[in-house]
A protein has these predicted regions:
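Short S/T/G/P-rich N-terminal loop/turn motif that feeds into the first structured element of a domain
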Residues: 1-68, 75-96
């Protein structure tokens, strides 16, 4: 197994009546190159997704599949702001 050196983090807020639907979809979703994933509940309907990847290249290869997945769950999410839309994503190399 390749040592993980890249991660992505996505903050989002679910609509109260869509929480179960979201987790049904996310639990069926798999991205090649993603070694592990975590979802933290950070508020009543607020969540933070963390994906651990083999490399920056691995996430780049999966980008179109990730956008398709977001399109599938977008309706389950509340807008965070007009500037951000429904997600607040960041990614980068794991340094510690």
């Amino acid at each position: 197994m390749t040592s993980a050196n890249f991660m992505n983090v996505v903050r989002f807020k679910l609509k109260p009546d869509c929480i179960e639907k979201y987790f049904e979809v996310i639990n069926k979703t798999d991205f090649e190159g993603m070694i592990q994933r975590y979802i933290a509940k950070t508020g009543n309907y607020d969540y933070c997704f963390v994906g651990i990847w083999e490399s920056a290249e691995a996430i780049a290869v999966q980008r179109s599949k990730m956008i398709t997945h977001l399109d599938e769950v977008r309706g389950f999410m509340e807008e965070l702001s007009p500037e951000l839309g429904v997600t607040d994503p960041v990614s980068g190399n794991i340094v510690a």
